[in-house]
Amino acid sequence: MPLTVNCPICKAPVEWVPQSAFKPFCSERCKLIDLGDWASEKHVIPVKAEFDPEAFDEFDLDEGDFFKE
């Protein structure tokens, strides 16, 4: 018996088999709704937004000499 998952959009059951063209979605409609949510930034991948000056420490660069040639 194949694995069955719920569509992330409408919660309809979807069989996880090669013939399921839109898995994990149940249809192209649900797939496009999810794509639209990503495009409109309803879904985002969290990132550290602030600059970390300590990131330069691993390169042993002095900030005063950073842009000198």
From Swiss-Prot:
It comes from the Bacteria. Gene3D superfamilies: Erythroid Transcription Factor GATA-1, subunit A. Zn(2+) binds at C7, C10, C26, C30. It holds the Pfam family YacG. Binds 1 zinc ion. Its cofactor is Zn(2+). GO terms for molecular function: DNA topoisomerase type II (double strand cut, ATP-hydrolyzing) inhibitor activity; zinc ion binding. GO terms for biological process: regulation of DNA-templated transcription. The keyword Metal-binding applies. InterPro entries: DNA_gyrase_inhibitor_YacG (IPR005584), Znf_NHR/GATA (IPR013088). Keywords: Metal-binding, Zinc. Interacts with GyrB. Inhibits all the catalytic activities of DNA gyrase by preventing its interaction with DNA. Acts by binding directly to the C-terminal domain of GyrB, which probably disrupts DNA binding by the gyrase. Belongs to the DNA gyrase inhibitor YacG family. HAMAP family: DNA_gyrase_inhibitor_YacG. This is DNA gyrase inhibitor YacG. It comes from Shewanella baltica (strain OS185).
